[in-house]
Amino acid sequence: MALPAAHAADAPDASGEVNELNRVVVSATRTERAVQDVPATVSAIDRERMDNELTRNIRDLFRYEPGIDVGGNRERFGLGDIRIRGLGGNRVRVLIDGISVSDGFSIGSFSNAGRNFVDLDTVKEVEIVRGPSSALHGSDALGGVVSFVTKDPADYLKDGAKSYFGLKLGAESQNEGIYGSATAAFAGERWSGLVVVNHHQGKETENQGDNDAHDGSRTRANPQSVEGRSLLTKLVFAPSANQRFRLTVEGSEDRTQTDVFSALGLSALTPGLPPTAPRTRVLSMYGNDHQTRARVAFAHEIDSLDSALADSLTWQVYRQDSETTQRTREQRASVVGGRDTSPTLRLREFNFDQRVYGAEAAAHKDFATGSVEHTLTYGFEYEQTEFRQKRDGRSVNLTTGAVSSTISPDAFPVRDFPISKTRNAGVFVQDEIRFADGAFRLVPAVRVDRYELKPQNDAIWNGDNPGVKISDLSKTSVSPKLGAVWHFAQDWSLYGGYQRGFRAPPYSDVNLGFTNLQFGYTAIPNPNLKPETSNGYELGLRYSGKAVYAQLSGYYNDYKDFIESNRQVSAPPQTPLIVFQSQNVDKARIRGVELRGGVDFGELDPSLAGWSGRFAAAYSKGEDKSDDRPLESIAPLTATVGVAYDREAWGVELAGRFARRKSDLPEAGRFAAPGYGVFDLLAHWNFAPGAKFNVGVFNLGDKKYWDNGDVPGALTASSAILDRYTAPGRNVGASVAVSW
C-alpha cells in the first residue's frame, strides 16, 4: 500500500485554506490520486489540521466532518463507535496502516469492548471513504472505511536532516486532562528510525448536568480517573532509492476507573407488589476498565520494478493483539421493612481478546492500449483471527462469608460465544481506465472473499451451554464496483458509480452462548446465516477553481440480510424451552446529500489575502424496511462553517457547528435532541523556529446541547436525566510543541 506523505509537525502554516479536492488520498482506489480524480466521496485529515483543531480523541477528529458521528457511553465506557452515513459498529472497517482494528462487542450492563484503540498522537493522516467499499477492502466495509496512517521517519527528516527531536505538552479543561509526547527520528545513509512516546491522563469529561445525587437521578458525569500511554517505533532500511523495508512495533494502553454513582440507589418497585415488598439497594459500584493493543509489522515497498507484471509492489506481514478487561465491584443489600439486610459484594470480570495474523500485497501496473491509458491494481489479503470472550464473577455474603459463583441469571464463568477462529482471504483487481488524456476515467473493480469460521468447545462453553452444538461456517462473497469521473469542463467534474459492500456473518451470531435451563431458554447455532450486503449508488459534482472549491453528492444505499441476534424462533420438536437464534431478517435503506467546500478570499481580492472559509453539510434519511420505521442511528441535518485568517507565523479561525432537531424517531415518546448552533475559536502561533502554540475555546456561548452519538436509544422525552447526556459547556484546550 502506498502511503501519502504528511506535513512535518513543525511545518509552517500555509496562508489560506487548502483546496481539499487537490489533496492526494489512497484508500478509495489503493493508488495515490487527488480527490477530484476519485469516483467516491473521500475526505482526509492531516497532522497539521489535527494539531490546529486540538484533536485528542475520535470525536474531536470528526468534529467538523458532517455525515460522520461517534457513539459513546456517558455512564462509564466512553467513546467506541464510528458511524458513517448512519451505519456504524463493526459495519465500518477501521484500519491502522492497513490492519483492522479490533471488533467491538458488548453484552449487558457490565461488558462493553469498544473500538477506540488508536492514539491519535501517533497518526499523521486519516482518510475516510464514505459508503460501501468492499470491492477493495473486503468484509466489514459495509458503511465505509476509516484509515489511520501512522508517522514515518521521513515525515520529520526534511532537506537532508539527519536527526529530529520534538516535545509536545498540552492540557484541556473539559476533563482536566494533561498530555505529552516525545518524538525522535534519525537518518543514516540507508537506515532511518522513529520513536514516538505519548502519555495522557485526566478525569471524567464534563457535561452540563447539575444533579450530583448518588443514585439513578444523577445528571452530572460519574467521577473517573483516566490514564493512557502509547509507543510507536519504526526502523526503515532503504537499500536503494526506490525501495524500503520497514519494521513497525506499536503498542497502546488505556485505563479508566469509574465511580458509577448513577447506578446506585434503591431499585424500582415491581408493579403490582405492595410498598413493603423486598427491594434491592446498590450501595457502591466501581468500574476498572483496561484495554491494550500491540502490533508488529514488517513491510516492503518497491517503487520501481522492471517487470511485465508490475511497476510497483508493496507487501506486509503482521501480528496484532487487542485485549479488553473490565472489572466491576458492586456492594448491595436487600431492603426489608425499610432496613438494609444481607449485605452482598458482587465481583464481575469481562474479557474480550482478539489476536490476528495477516499478510497483504498490492501491485500496480501502468500500460496503454492505443490512446487509452490503464493503471491496473491487484493484490490479496489474508487474516487469521482468534476471538476469546469470557464473563466471570462471584457473590460474597458479607454477613456469613458464603461465596457463590451464581449472579442471576448467570452461573459463572460463561462464554457468550465459543472460542472462535476465523480465516479471511480476499483477492482483488481494479483497472483505472483513462480516456481523452484523463478527461474521462472509468474504474471497474471486483473482489472475491472467502470467510471460514471454526469454533472450539471447551469446559466453560460446555458447562454454560449443555447439549448445545456449535457449527462451522464457510461463505464466499463477490463484491464488484464501477466508478467514473468526467472532467467535462475546466475546473468542473462529475463523478459517481455503484459499489457493493458486505459483512461476513459474525462469529458471535453463528454460535450463541444464550442458554439457561433454570429460566427455560436456550440458543441454537445458525450455520446458514448469510452475509449482510449493501448496494450503494452515488452521483456527485465537483468544482475546483483557484479561489473556490466545492463538492455536492447524493447517495442511495440499500442494505439487506441484516442479522438480528437472539431472535426467538420456533422450538424443535420435544424441546420444552424457549429457543433463540440469530437470523437474517432486516432490510434498510439510507439516502442522503452531502456538501462541502472552501473559499480563498485572497484569490478573489488581493486585499483579503490570508482570509479563507470552509463549509460542509450532510443530510441523511433512513428506514428499516422490515417494519417501515425510521433508523435510529441516522444523525439529523448537520453543518459546519469556518472563517479563518492566516499569516506566515500565526492564524485564527472561528468555526461553527450546527445540527437540526432530530425528528425521525422509531417510536413515539422518544427524546428528540433539539437543534443547536455552537461556535469554537481556534488559534495557532509559530512563535519561534520549530516552536508552535495552539489554543482553542470550544462552545464559546456555553450552550447546552446534545450530541447525537451520546443519546441512548431508549431515552424518553419525559426522562428526568436528559442532562446526563449533554455535551461539555465552554471549555479550553491548549498545546505547545518544540522541535530541533
Predicted regions and their residues:
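Acidic, small-polar-rich N-terminal luminal/periplasmic segments of exported/outer-membrane proteins
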Residues: 12, 16-160, 262, 539
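C-terminal beta-signal and adjacent terminal beta-strands/loops
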Residues: 104, 502, 555, 560-561, ...
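Face-selective signature of the C-terminal outer-membrane beta-barrel domain
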Residues: 238, 242-252, 291-460, 469, ...
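Transmembrane beta-strands of outer-membrane beta-barrel pores
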Residues: 150, 169-175, 188-190, 199-203, ...
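Extracellular loop and loop/strand-boundary signature of outer-membrane beta-barrel proteins
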Residues: 110-111, 166-169, 216-221, 280-288, ...
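Outer-membrane beta-barrel signature, preferentially recognizing the C-terminal barrel domain
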Residues: 273-305, 416-422, 470-479, 483, ...
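Gram-negative outer-membrane beta-barrel transporters
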Residues: 363-365, 377, 435-436, 442, ...
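Periplasmic-side early beta-strands and strand-to-turn transitions of outer-membrane beta-barrels
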Residues: 154, 162-166, 172, 179, ...
